[in-house]
Amino acid sequence: VIVSNLPRAVGVTRRAVRKLDPVPEVLELDVTDADQLAALPQQLRDLGVEKLDGVVHAIAFANPKTALGGKFLETEWDDVSVAVHTSTYSYVSLMTALVDILAEHASVVGLTFDATVSWPFYDWMGVAKAGLESANRYLARYLGPKGVRCNLVSAGPLDTMAKTAIPGADAFNDVWGERAPLGWDTKDTTPAAKGIVALLSDWFPAT
């Protein structure tokens, strides 16, 4: 297992992964930087990784002051482009950078949040997630012939650091809890994590 994060946030990641045994390597990576993406395969080879069995894309960002929280009609293109580049296009650009070192029957898993409806406060992140879901279908079309599986996990709201940056995000909690037939606990990341692990495994060879 190898983990990455933005250079400015990599310290937080290093502290978090210390809970794991063995502790994984942590790379500094800005997926919006073409040069860093181009250098990534060699960085992985230098760590002894010849082939990747799976990739988890858990990357998203929209400026909470300008692109979230009910300011949808006022958001300028510069902020929209950051949200789409980081949250949508990076899924494709990351896999384009890694395609030559993907193992046979590798699995790619990304994270989304139901983009079939408009959510209060979610605004341009909702648009970016809709783009991500469409991008995943195209990624599956183009990587499928290489034996690579591409899927997204659409979990309910979880009490993560990312969620705290969304103004009004707690409003999701009650709505999701009321609608989910099996119920939903925003503090329990296990269901989402198990879904990701299952898709990374070989238990879904044609999914």
Language model regions located:
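Residue-level signal for the nucleotide or nucleotide-sugar donor/cofactor binding architecture
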Residues: T32, Y89, T186-T190
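Hydrophobic structural elements of the Rossmann-like NAD(P)H-binding subdomain
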Residues: V56, V109, C150-V153, K163
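Short, small/polar-rich loop/turn modules that mediate ligand/substrate recognition or access, typified
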Residues: G144, R149, A206-T207
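Catalytic loop of short-chain dehydrogenase/reductase
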Residues: A60-D100, E104-P145, P157-T160
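C-terminal substrate-recognition "lid" of short-chain dehydrogenase/reductases
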Residues: D185-T207
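Short-chain dehydrogenase/reductase
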Residues: V1-D78, Y91, M95, N136-R137, T164-A165, A171-F172, ...
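A glycine/serine/threonine-rich, flexible loop-to-helix segment
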Residues: R15, W124, P145, A155-P181
